[in-house]
Amino acid sequence: LSKAPVIYSHSSAKAIANHPRNVPDDVLKRIAVNRGVVMINFFSGFVVPESAEIMREMFHVRRGLMAKYPNSKKDVDREYKAWQLKNPFPAGEAKIIADHIDHVVKVAGIDCVGLGSDYDGITTIPKGMEDVSTYPLLTELMLQRGYSEEDIHKVLYKNVLRALKECERAAKKMSSQP
């Protein structure tokens, strides 16, 4: 087991959106013991339940196309793109991000959740969370759900900074051991 906090930098709660990249509750409980952080991703395919289902189907479609056209990436890409256009991800609403935060807090505690928006690598984002300028909406949603100012600061930055500092301490300790 890791002697340093584990950071899931771009994951969410699997109990809400069943995607393989998301973190199941049994692992969330271990994250709490490890003092790690699950940083909620904003990609609709990871956080919106219906979109996560489409993503799971999408993997199977892609594998099937690769078997159908083993020597033609062009054909795979063409049919895959057509399938994607017929099966768009529902974007969802900003509240789904707060739902994931709530779930991680419920299972692992307020010290184990952060934000891993992934704005530079995603295509579909819940409405209201289009870029970092929309964070005040998420802050407002958290206030409405009873989070304190300190809790919100933990989610926005304090938890991941704490975990990174603990990782640095663990690395120094391990590097000084024979």
Where are these regions (language model features)?
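Histidine/acidic residue-rich metal-binding segments in metalloenzymes
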Residues: 1-7, 20-36, 96-111
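Conserved, mostly hydrophobic/aromatic
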Residues: 10, 31, 38, 118, ...
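Active-site glycine- and acidic-residue-rich loops that bind
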Residues: 12-23, 47-49, 88-98
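Solvent-exposed loop/turn segments at secondary-structure junctions
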Residues: 13-15, 44-47, 119-122, 159-162
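Short acidic/histidine-rich active-site segments
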Residues: 40-45, 107-130
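C-terminal helical cap
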Residues: 76-95, 99-102, 149-164
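Mid-to-C-terminal alpha-helical segments outside catalytic/metal-binding sites
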Residues: 130-178
